[in-house]
Amino acid sequence: MVRMKKARKTEKANKAKKDITADTEASVVDVNSLSGKKVDKFKLNPDIFGAKVNKPLLHDTVVMHQANQRQGNTSTKSKGFVRGGGKKPWRQKGTGRARAGSIRSPLWRHGGVIFGPVPRDFSYEMPKKMKALALISSLSAKSKDNEIMVLEKDLELKQPKTKEIAKLLDALKSCSERVLFLYSTRNENLIKSCRNIKNVTLKTCSDFNTYDVLSNRKLLFSKDTHDAIVKRLKK
């Protein structure tokens, strides 16, 4: 009996080890030139793009993000806040009617609302480590779904050119898909070039979050941006 238990524990440990090894295998993706042609292969960092995907944590992070976006200004009036209703409609006894104390009772037309919503703050925060793990999980999920595109270098535009970005997306066959475009350093020309394209979300590698990754179909960044993302998440 003891030997059987030890054998089961060893088997479980080996299985877990295999699962971890499988999860930490990062994808090898194609490197695209700025004209959209495949020029090389690139191995994504296994700790960031090959980790185990924690679906419950991803769900919690998305719920938190959506809660933080709520304005929280919905408002209703209870019996005490509706105008009027201070006088008792009729005497308590002797009329044959049901007793009533106010015409603004929730049972009456134009009455108050019972336990209705009032303005409040819905926002809350998660621990920093959980946020970081959720972001790693989202990047790993994109890697496993082959939804990451890598450029050989950052785009350097001398002037705003929406046409150049549209041409690149067309070459990468991502015109009709939602794309999260990450870049390492702020570039005003790039921002102006992308803001008129409906399906493109432009973010720096220091301020994108889990919701940004999951709400877009494809992820696009350069080799330098990849290194900056790894540096951010390995702190």
PLM-predicted stretches and their roles:
Residues 71-75, 80:
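Short, structured surface segments that line ligand/substrate-binding pockets
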